[in-house]
Every structure is written in structure tokens, then in C-alpha cells.
Amino acid sequence: MTVVVEGQQRTHELVIITGMSGAGKTVAIQSFEDLGYYCIDNLPPALLTTFLTLLRDSGKNSTRIAAVMDMRGGNFFDALIGALDHILKEGDIVARILFLDADDATLVRRYKETRRAHPLAVSGLPLDGIKQERALLSEVKGRANFVYNTSNMKPKQLREKIVKEFASEADTIFTVNIMSFGFKHGMPIDADLVFDVRFLKNPYYVEELRPKTGLQTEVSSYVLALEDTQILIQKLTDLFDFMIPLYRQEGKSQLVIAFGCTGGQHRSVTLAEFFGAYLASKENTVITHRDINRRKE
């Protein structure tokens, strides 16, 4: 059920994630979060209209929201259809339901593997809770826009399916972030790959280069002319050409590559600029020099 009204402005998108407990809702909400959706876990349907009213009052022109609604909401879950009808009347939000399902045997196996209790299994037997939940969700499943059976899916496959269905063109852009930094200011905690280039000859000890940075030709030419730098560039070029397509294939949205030297002024900046320019012809690339303005610290 897609809730739309022709002729009215629709500025917000809502994806309601629901379905059987153990069918993959946690993986789903994480996938939507990676796509840039504002995500809410375990939102009671009775509060959905209140939340959307606050969203409208915020004045934001466009927002994408993904909300998990499941049987943890108790009796509130009965309010879901009423909340969707309310959205239909307002007409400024496109709402879709993603229902995640799996066969009974798979759900029982998953509960046993995690050693968690089914939320509706009063007797303690997962199958009893599964049967009760399936009956309670039958109407919602019938009104869903998308029904994914995850019985034979791995988490990665579910994520790929969600990305294929719900990602915009902007969401699928893979970005390589190239960073320079100084070890004396601490290692970057968000880097995927860190390369220590302190083994290269340091321009800091060349008096006329000391006050300059790797952004200036005198320093970059000095660093790039070193034999060790040329060998490093050759090896890292081969490594990046091999690895980066595989990172993209794995579904990563970004890769952070950091080059570190002592202070983050000369060698790391030069290498970050070089590989930023090299990768820019292949990938969406962003260059950041974290410590370049911390010379006196």
C-alpha cells in the first residue's frame, strides 16, 4: 500500500519496516541508516502521527524516514492501519510498508542460535509465539508494498536487496576519503587504512622547507623525488587498484585512507594530495588535511 494523493505536494518519504520477529528487521533498519534515512526502532504506531506532525512543524523540505514497528509495541500495533489512513488524508508523505518474513523452521532456528525468547512465546516455545505473531500480522502483510522472504538470505543479501530497491542515485555513490595527519596529534579513529610514511626523509630538517607544507610545490617535489617515495607510490597504486573495487563490491559507501607523518605537515600531506589526484579519475574523492593548521602545537 503506497499512500499518495495526486496533485498534492509530497515532500517526505516514510518506510515502515515490520514483519516476523527474527526475519531481519535489525539488518533492515541498519541498511536504511546507511542509506541516510532517519531511523526509528520500535516506534509505537499510536505515536506515528504525532511524530509526523512534529516533522511537518520542523519546516524541513524533504526527509526520508524508516521506522521499525513490530509486536514489541503490544496493543499499539493495532493502530498502524489507522495511522496510515491519517497519512493518506494529509497527502504530503509517501508511505510504504516493507514486510520481512521467513518460514517457521528458519525463525525457530534463528531464535535457538541467538538464545533469545520470542516476544509472544508465553509458554517459552518459539513456535507458539511465531504462529500467534503470524496470525496477528496477516492483515498488515496483505497491505505491504514489499514482502521479503529472508529464509534463505544472509544479512549481506538482505542489505543488497534493500539498497537496490530503496537507494537513490546519490546513495550509491562510493566515496574515497583521503586524509593526512600527524602521529603526534593522535591517530584518526575513523580510518579504514592507515599508512605510516615517517620512514621517508623528512623535509622538516631542510631549513627552507620547514615553514612550508606539502601543499606547496617545493615540499611536494622534494618528497616525490625521493627513491623510497617512488617505490611506495608504485606499491600503493597496485594495492589501491586491487582493493578499492572490492570494497565497493562489498557494499561500503565510503573508504577512509589516512597517511600519517610526525606532524602532519609535509610527507603525509604530499602523499594524500598525490593519491587524491590519482584516485579522483576513478572514484568520488575527498581530501582532508587534519593537522595542517596545527604547526605550533
Swiss-Prot record:
The superkingdom of the source organism is Bacteria
InterPro entries per the UniProt record, alphabetical: P-loop_NTPase, RapZ-like, RapZ-like_N, RapZ_C
**Any one GO molecular function term:** GTP binding
- Annotated ATP binding sites: G19, M20, S21, G22, A23, G24, K25, T26
Pfam families for this protein: PapZ_C, RapZ-like_N
| Alphabetical keyword list | ATP-binding, GTP-binding, Nucleotide-binding
Q: Where does GTP bind?
A: D70, M71, R72, G73
Q: What does this protein do?
A: Displays ATPase and GTPase activities.
Q: Which NCBIfam families does the record match to this protein?
A: PRK05416.1
Family designation: Belongs to the RapZ-like family.
Q: What is this protein called?
A: Nucleotide-binding protein Bsph_0448
Q: Which organism is it from?
A: Lysinibacillus sphaericus (strain C3-41)
Specify the taxonomic lineage: Bacteria, Bacillati, Bacillota, Bacilli, Bacillales
